[in-house]
Each structure stands twice: as structure tokens, then as C-alpha cells.
């Protein structure tokens, strides 16, 4: 059980960290393109669009690097979960409003759809696992002790 | 790992992409040596291109190109599904040969009346409305020039070389860095970007 959890822990860190690094790196290549995607959501005031396009990729890169380094992993995972939840909420609201916008997540021309929302939910799972890992371990230990 | 990460990030920051032809015969506004250059690949019949021109580029032309802070270059990229866009591009290029004033007037008219001529194919009427009778007659002669089709083909080839897959797509070059943008961008966002570079 402990070995399986350890493997899962590393897999989640590597996958999630890699995704955040790639996503941030991609957005850094053209902050204006990312700004165009944010503008497409029609949710953010114009004055916030460029600052978001400038700084959000760095936040993603920092989260990716911290996830890979393992430093304060629980808090970093909570941060990653919060960011992913915000993305999911924004994508869902934009989709429900019927706006034909680009996701701007990992590539351009990727329109917001149930598929892009489901993809973000899938990415959220390892982040939630890492954030709740200690509790899961404690629960597992308690269960093992009780059944002994 | 972190050194590799930093190297990767550093590679994301400098310019990437193919530098375009620096000649400015297709410069719709601004000086060729302006600190910011925008190259737009556009289709006259595409509604998003109309939106980009009417809501963003016209304001860029007014506020930045007139002060030579930004140079806007338009490349023709007529899409196959739009039956009249190549004809519109030919008229636009013919007007370009008369001068920037006439060219801008034709581009303005074509985008402003897009819904009308796109529907009935009355491109010529939209062009006639934008020019004096004399200039219109000159455009009717110039449009026969086979080099106009050559320019369109060159623009399309340039777009394909730069991986333009849809319209509008534009490239902004500033501070030695080129950024590709697919789709529209509100003027206020672009203005904030410009004002960091040229006040």
C-alpha cells in the first residue's frame, strides 16, 4: 500500500508539474495570443487582460517547478487545485454563455467545449490527490490499525 | 533540472518565427522603421477580419500609425470558401498602386460594406463608392495588371511559410521579438501593450 501510494505520489507530481511547465512555457511564447484568448472569454475587464497574460504563465511555471521539486508539496498542490478550479469555472461559464472562444490552454484553435472542460477536471484529480495525500495516508493507517 | 528549465524558458523569450519582407509597399499606415510592426494576414470576406480592422486596426492607424509609432502591413490571404475575397483583394491592391490614401479608402469601404458585397458579389460598387471617378477609372485599368495576382500569390505563400492557417492572423514585432496572434484582439489590450513600448 505504501509503495503504491509513493508511486502514485511521484506520478502525480511529474505529470502535474510537467503540464504546468508546458502550459506556462507555451503561453510565454506569445503573451499577446494568450491575451487574445482571455479577451475571447468576455469575462475579464480589458485593463486586467495584459497583466494576466504577462503574469499567469509565470505562476504556472512556478507551480510546475515547485511540484517537481516537492517543496511544501501540500500547499503547492492546494494552490494548483485552486488555479485549476478557477480555470474550470471560467471555461464552464464561457461555454454556458454560448461564447465561441478559444481555450488558450495548451494550443490555439482549441475551442472551449465539454472536452476541454473534462480535460481540466482530469488534470485537477492529481492536484487534489497531492493536496489530500496526508489525510488519505492517515485514514489508511487508521483503517489498518482498526482491522488488526 | 532547474538549469535545463531556465534554458528552456530563456528560449521562449526571444523572437521566434520567420522575419517577413521588410519592404513597405503594403504598409497601410506608419513608417517602415516604426518601433512596432504589425503584419496582418487578412481576408476581405471574413467577418473576424472585418471586426479586427473596424474595431482595432482603424484605431491603431489613427492613434499610432499617424505618429509613426506603429507600422501596419496588410497581406492578402483570401480563403477558398469565400468566392469574392480574391476579387476584393485585387481591387485593394490596385488601389494601393494609386497611393496610401486611396488604398485606405478602398480597404475601409470593403470592410465597412462587407455584408452587402459578400452577399451579392458587388465588390466593384463598394470600391466605386470609396474613390473619386478618376481614381476609380484608374483602378479599373490597374486591376487588369497580371502582377496583382502575383502579389496575392506571394502573400499567400508568405502566410503559408509563416504557418498562417486562418484569418485574421497577425504578427507583432517589437523590441526584437515577434509574437503571433490568431484571431482578434481588443484595441484597449493592444494599446496597453504599445504604450509600454512607445508612449
Sequence positions of predicted segments:
Chain A
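Membrane-interfacial helix-loop segments of redox and metal-homeostasis proteins
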Residues: 1-138
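Short, low-complexity, charge-dense intrinsically disordered segments
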Residues: 141-148
Amino acid at each position: 500500500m505504501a509503495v503504491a501510494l509513493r508511486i502514485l505520489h511521484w506520478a502525480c507530481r511529474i505529470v502535474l508539474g510537467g503540464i504546468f511547465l508546458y502550459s506556462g512555457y507555451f503561453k510565454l511564447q506569445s503573451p499577446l495570443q494568450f491575451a487574445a484568448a482571455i479577451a475571447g472569454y468576455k469575462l475579464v475587464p480589458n485593463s486586467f487582460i495584459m497583466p494576466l497574460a504577462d503574469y499567469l504563465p509565470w505562476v504556472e511555471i512556478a507551480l510546475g517547478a515547485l511540484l517537481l521539486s516537492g517543496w511544501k508539496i501540500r500547499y503547492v498542490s492546494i494552490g494548483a487545485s485552486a488555479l485549476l478550479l478557477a480555470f474550470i469555472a471560467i471555461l464552464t461559464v464561457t461555454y454556458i454563455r454560448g461564447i465561441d472562444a478559444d481555450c488558450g490552454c495548451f494550443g490555439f484553435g482549441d475551442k472551449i467545449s465539454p472536452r476541454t472542460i473534462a480535460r481540466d477536471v482530469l488534470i485537477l484529480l492529481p492536484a487534489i490527490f497531492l493536496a489530500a495525500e496526508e489525510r488519505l495516508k492517515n485514514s489508511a493507517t487508521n483503517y489498518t490499525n482498526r482491522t488488526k | 533540472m532547474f538549469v535545463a528549465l531556465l534554458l528552456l524558458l530563456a528560449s521562449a523569450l526571444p523572437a521566434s518565427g520567420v522575419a517577413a519582407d521588410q519592404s513597405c509597399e503594403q504598409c497601410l499606415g506608419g513608417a517602415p522603421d516604426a518601433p512596432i510592426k504589425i503584419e496582418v494576414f487578412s481576408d476581405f470576406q471574413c467577418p473576424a477580419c472585418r471586426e479586427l480592422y473596424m474595431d482595432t486596426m482603424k484605431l491603431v492607424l489613427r492613434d499610432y500609425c499617424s505618429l509613426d509609432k506603429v507600422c501596419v502591413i496588410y497581406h492578402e490571404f483570401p480563403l477558398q470558401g469565400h468566392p469574392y475575397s480574391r476579387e476584393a483583394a485585387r481591387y485593394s491592391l490596385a488601389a494601393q498602386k494609386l497611393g496610401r490614401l486611396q488604398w485606405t479608402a478602398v480597404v475601409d469601404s470593403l470592410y465597412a460594406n462587407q455584408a452587402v458585397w459578400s452577399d451579392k458579389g458587388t465588390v466593384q460598387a463598394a470600391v466605386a463608392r470609396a474613390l473619386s471617378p478618376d481614381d476609380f477609372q484608374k483602378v479599373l485599368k490597374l486591376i487588369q495588371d497580371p502582377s496583382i495576382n502575383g502579389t496575392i500569390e506571394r502573400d499567400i505563400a508568405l502566410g503559408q511559410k509563416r504557418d498562417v492557417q486562418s484569418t485574421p492572423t497577425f504578427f507583432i514585432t517589437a523590441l526584437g521579438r515577434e509574437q503571433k496572434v490568431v484571431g482578434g484582439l481588443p484595441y484597449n489590450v493592444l494599446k496597453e501593450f504599445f504604450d509600454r513600448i512607445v508612449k
